[in-house]
Amino acid sequence: MQWTALEPTKELQAILGFNKAQNWDDFDLALRDFMAPAQNFVFADKSGTIAYRANGHVPIRKIGDGKLPVPGDSSDYGWEGYVPFDELPTVINPEEGYIATANNEIVGEEYPYYITDFWAQPYRYERIAQLLESKEKLSVQDMKDIQMDTVNLYAAEFLPHFIETFKAADTADEYSQIIASLEAWNYDETIDSGQSLVFNFMMEEIKETLFKDAMPEDVY
């Protein structure tokens, strides 16, 4: 079993460097010592510089992408080092004026190295960006509110299509109250939201309907 975190690393030294950093160059230098596990790092200093780096050791594989086990008795499937530090995904002072990250996909097809296919769905990132762009200047309270925000853009994308289907179904009259309630929903998943309960139940049922009978029981 080969894993970057099983190799000698210097994360504690990196963290000490973060705490002593006076600017992005200092922080960037300390990042060189943070090797595993790979992390999304965001940076800001009092001069106004903001930056982001997807940092850590990312293997360059001779064959394959690491999704499935490979023969361990052949060097053909080994690693050819790591993605060079200076080629890790990095953003410094973007035009948007902010940086947001939520484990979303950070590189496109043009990026020359394989990182992973297991990105989070984009909805959390999109909601963060939506809130950051909602005001020209954000207060500390605004930032606290962003941390506690529960609006579900996943529901906002899919639910309107479901509602159209419900209305066209033979059972539309029977479930008219539920349909009307879902139509009125603002997609905020508060603790007492009945619409949120219905939506998430539907998503679980869709998963069951699509995949349960099509996949072996031991891998579902």
Residue ranges and their predicted role:
Residues D45-Y220:
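Long, compositionally biased non-active-site segments enriched in small/hydrophobic residues and glycine
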Residues M1-Y77:
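Glycine- and hydrophobic-rich flexible loops that cap the catalytic core of alpha/beta enzyme folds
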